[in-house]
């Protein structure tokens, strides 16, 4: 399904405006996530510069560990962006591929229902405060840059096809992975048009329902 009013910008500092560039709606049913096979372009590994970004619109309640997007398998963890029952959204990652997370950091404390958000996760170099999360262009978190296990797991968007009850009711638009560049390094005005194939773009999807 495609949500009629899909996002491409913001009005003021709070709500994203109506957009016309397309999105993919996930209804929360098991096995309905978008899955993409592994390739080296989307293995973040120890790369010092990368960006994951997308627009998201939650249409129902999260349960703990709902997968908004992520890469990895049941036996080999890489990274996941997950929603929780209290409405918060975290990034979880493994540096060694084990099934114990190396780190878990909150991106936002509450993703409200029926509202578009632009979310961006950025690594910009190595060292202190070189990983940052942004929601609607405002930095919400920073920490020391971290490595992510460069595994061969599938990339999942809008749920997790490797298990049951990890599929949120959510609409995703303009999902982009840039591997080799940091698109944002400080607070910014969220995009007002569909995302484009900038330098080092390795994946750009969910711009229509096909």
Predicted features and spans:
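Extracellular glycan-recognition modules
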Residues: 32-92, 125-130, 166, 181-186
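Short hydrophobic/aromatic patches on beta-strands that form ligand-binding or substrate-lining surfaces
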Residues: 51-60, 69, 119-121, 157, ...
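Surface-exposed loop/edge segments in extracytoplasmic proteins
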Residues: 77-78, 99-104, 138-143
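Extended recognition patches within non-cytosolic domains
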Residues: 1-29, 132, 138-141, 172-210
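Short surface loop/edge beta-strand patches of beta-sandwich-type extracellular domains
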Residues: 27-50, 72, 102-110, 161-164, ...
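Extracellular repetitive beta-rich solenoid segments
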Residues: 74-75, 112-115, 127, 196-201
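Extracellular glycan-interaction patches encoded by glycine-rich segments
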Residues: 71, 96, 151-173
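Short, aromatic/His-centered strand-loop micro-motif at the edge of beta-sheets
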Residues: 92-118
